[in-house]
Regions:
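Acidic, metal-coordinating catalytic segment for phosphate/diphosphate chemistry
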Residues: 2-31
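Nudix hydrolase/Nudix homology domain
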Residues: 49, 120-165
Length: 165
């Protein structure tokens, strides 16, 4: 893949050991990769001690770019310019398919966070984490519960593939 080229979006299929057909539910989301001063923006759910890239589900009538901008504002209070669509991860967990689209984003402004009640309950907090520390955090995916194992493997895969470019 050539950096800056939107022609090739790498698609990765990831199957959890818990996956069982048929797929009964699917969810499409967009996530932002935001790097600044060798730190990556992550969302930390303090109550579960779970990290992930900021992002969330695409709402009806919303483009991927609109979803990514909205989610970064809601979860981190950041206005971003949405760049290249880097990766699509198809996560097969239990009887569900989670489709995560990752975009390279750049901060262009600061606004107000607007967390959902669930995100508030989970203690969602944006954190700038050293890239090497983020890789180390996500490398422990095998030590997680099945749903978090898949999430951490997804994040570990994306971060490593991004750094290979």
């Amino acid at each position: 893949m050539i950096k800056g080229s939107k022609a090739m979006i790498e698609t990765i299929n990831q199957y959890s050991k818990t996956f069982k057909e048929p797929i009964r539910k699917s969810r499409t989301s967009c996530r932002g990769i935001v790097i600044k001063d060798n730190k990556i923006l992550l969302v930390h759910e303090l109550n579960k001690d779970v990290y992930m890239s900021p992002g969330g589900g695409v709402e009806q009538g919303e483009s991927f770019e609109q979803c990514c901008r909205r989610e970064l504002m809601e979860e981190a209070g950041l206005d971003v310019s949405v760049g290249e669509h880097l990766f699509t991860i198809n996560e097969y967990v239990f009887d569900e398919l989670f489709i995560s689209n990752y975009f390279l984003c750049e901060v262009v402004g600061v606004g107000e966070m607007a967390l959902t009640p669930t995100e508030i309950d989970h203690g969602v907090t944006p954190e700038w984490v050293d890239v090497e520390k983020a890789i180390e955090i996500f490398s422990h995916y095998k030590e997680k519960t099945p749903d978090h194992e898949s999430l951490y493997l997804r994040e570990y895969t994306v971060l490593n593939k991004f750094l290979e470019q």
